[in-house]
Every structure is written in structure tokens, then in C-alpha cells.
Amino acid sequence: MRKLLYIALPVVLLAACTKDISRFNDETKKPQTVPGPMLFSNAVKNISDGLQNASVNINVFRFTVKHWAMAVYQDEAQFDFTTRGIPQAWWTRMYRDALSDLQEASRIISADATLDPGIKQNQLAIIDVMQVYAYGILVNSFGNVPYKDALNSDNLFPTYDDAKTVYADLMKRLADDLGKLNTASLGFGASDDIIFGDPIASTKTGVDGTVIKYLKFAATVQMKMGMVLAAVDNAAAKTAVETADAKAIASAADNALFKYLSNSPSYSPLYSDIVVGKRSDYVAAKDLMDQLIAMSDPRKTLFFGTNNNGDYVGGIVGKVNTFSDVSKPASNVYAATAPYVFADYVETEFLRAEAKERGYTVAGTAEQHYNNAITASILFWGGSAADAATYLARPDVAYTTATGAWKQKIGFQKWIGLYSRPFDGWVEIRRLDYPQLSLPVNAKSGFPNRFTYPLNEQQLNGTNYTTAAAAIGGDKVETKLFWDKF
């Protein structure tokens, strides 16, 4: 009987397929058009995945800023970024996996004559905000990068644009986007907006208030990028920050969070790395852990678990650490649904505190914003308002008595507040110069102020690579970016 079934099955299938054989003339290998909103959400996910990831093949920043250490493999913790091709992976993720999709999404949506003009304007502005965000990551990672010639398939050898010029254009684009976002119209539907929409409710056509939240997100990005310029163009920084302040994130309810789900392949990259991948590599860094312990920081138990003896112990960055002897990240940090924070109230309040210290016109006092930022961080991770009040009452935490001038006070607390946002932590350490971290054991270089350019660029785009390397002062990790003057 089984043999007869095997013989009969092809006959049945052939009969079923003979009703319409014209479809076999279709170009089955030609990709079908992907909707613009889907490309947008895919690009945003690729950015988020890269920024949250803990894989040493993708994201090394937790070790660079000494939030985490490694148990066994020390290459990346020791600033060896070339063995695994980290610069290439970072470059590819931003250009190919994010910016290329965002550009195509913009093209498709622009050409859609059926789309309501107001919705189209909002969608294009939101896409551009994310393009600015991604290009900002590239500039802050490498310095001069392809910009005007980037993403042009007809030009395989793009020139590199001056980083400061790129930054100025990004700031202009961001200001234009803020002017175009119109709260009278919807933006992306809920199934495509994984930051402010509900990713599960795919039947919805829109979510009230999402455009307002994108306005706040874009304004915080404007503040953040503006402040990066403070040491090299204080006038431009002041204008950007003061313009954005009233529009920027004003509470935790405005936080821009990429929402991961509990099922594969949509769960958090940290969950994928640590739980699914069963990695026993990642441990607390002694540098951060010692500070959390010394200051009785309520985030200690929210950031990390104990070692096998029930104690909180950090591992030495760059040195082999016995996994059972040191603390590991707390389970909430790598939960399947742990979100990635694109921008939040914590960061925005630290920016406002800094703005007051720089003499910019923003409401409130530096101390108020500093306190708000720390409180928001403790609450975000699951602490209480009472925990925050007790912590802020400590002389080594209180703004008026904490060690150092404002850069040190804000820089130190921002380093803690940007836990699980290590790329942004790397930017802030370079910008504010605090905390002043010691080099890891057996460091392969000085502190990395940038990534070197990818090997592919050196080999395939050699002339433009050589010009770019000379323009920034040499393709070395120690070379400072244009905004890093101190």
C-alpha cells in the first residue's frame, strides 16, 4: 500500500498543477517588492540588535566601557578588534542592514500614490530620523565615512566625507524632520512601528500619539548630537540643545524602546546570546561592581546576580576570570523581552543637567536634572523612589558634595545610567572624559577612541581609504574624532 501511495502522489500533484501552468513563466528568482514599512521595521531591528548584542563578533562596547568582563576569551576585552573583524561587522550592519533598507523604504513610500499625504510625510520624516541616528553611530565609531556617495550601487568606490561636515548635515536633516512631523496625521501602523507601536496588534492601522513620541525622540537625538559638538562648536551645540529642550523626552512614558518578544526569532539578542547560546562568558566588571558596592547602589542587584558563594564580585577586564567566582548579569538584563533603549528620560535629564552647567538656557537646575536622571535610572531597572532618595542622600552621590567638577559628577553617574547601552556609554566617556578607566590587562592598544576602518575598505577602496585615514590623523584606534578635543 505504501508503494502505491508513492506512485500515486506525483500523479495527484501533476493533476493539481495543470489547471494553470502560466505561472511557471514567472521570474521566481526575482525578489518580490517588500513594503516600505516592513523595510523600515527591519532596519530598526537591525540597529537595535547590533546595539544590544553581547556577541564579541558584533558588539564589544560592554568591555570597552568596563561594564562587563569576559571569563575566558579575552581578545576583544583587550582591544583586539581585528581578529574577529569587528569594524567590518559594525560597518556592514549600519550600511547594508540598516541604512540600505531605510533608503529603499523611503523610495517605496515616496512613490506610493495611494498613501495619504500626511501619513506619507510623517513616515518619510520618521525614516529620516532613523537614518540620521544610524549615520551618527557611524561617524562616532569611525570619523570620516562615506556619506554623499554611500548606498549608491553604481559607485563601488565611495569617497569619504569629512565627519564634521557630515555631522552638520545630519543636524540640519534632524531639524527639518522635526518641522515635518505632524501630529494631525498618523505615522506607521502598529505592526511596523516596533518602538512606539504595539508589535502584537497587527490588525491596528495606527496608534494614537506615536507621532508625538517620535517628535520627542527626534528632539532628544537633536539634544544628544548637539551636545557632542559642545567642545568644537559651542554655538551650534547651544542652539541645538535650546531648540530641542522643550520638545524632548519629558518622562519615562516617552522612552523610545525597541520591544522584543518572547518567541524566536524576535527575542532579545542578549537572551539569544546567553540563554539560547548557553554562553558562560559574560561577567560583571570589577570597575563597575566596585563602585556599585562602595556606594550601596540599589542597581547592584538589578544589574548583576551573585557568584556561586552568594557574593557580589567583579571580574578583571582583560584577565581570565573563573566563572563561578564572579557575578553574572542579572536575569532581567537578558530576559527574552528585555528592550533596547534608543533614547530615554535618563539620558535626556543628564543632557539637561550638562546644558545648565554649560550656561545654556533650559528650565530647572543642574542638580534637579541630575537627580531626575538617577531616579529614573533606578526606577527603570526596578528600584523604588525610596531607593533613589536614599542613594541621592549619600554625600558621594549628592550633586553638591559628590567628587569633582560637573563633568566628573555627571560623567560618572551617566556611565552607570547607560548600563546596557554601552555604545552610548563609549561616546560619553570619550566626550566627558569621565570616568577615567584604566586599561584592561594586556591591552593591545591605548583606549580606543574609534574603530579602524574595515579591512575590505582598505583592500577594495584603497585610494579613498588612504585619503580618509590621512585626513583624520591616521587609521588608529587611538586617533581622536573631531569632537573629542580633551
Residue ranges and their predicted role:
Residues 1-26:
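Bacterial Sec-dependent N-terminal signal peptides
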Residues 17, 204, 272-296, 300-304, ...:
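Long, intrinsically disordered, low-complexity segments
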Residues 17-85, 89, 96, 104, ...:
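Membrane-proximal, proline-rich intrinsically disordered regions
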Residues 34-37, 71-385, 400-407, 413:
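Structured, solvent-exposed acidic/aromatic patches
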Residues 54, 61-62, 150, 188, ...:
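Residue-level signal for alpha-helical context at structural boundaries
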Residues 59, 63, 125-128, 221, ...:
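Short alpha-helical segments used as structural interaction elements across diverse proteins
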Residues 377-379, 388-395:
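C-terminal beta-barrel architecture of Gram-negative outer-membrane proteins
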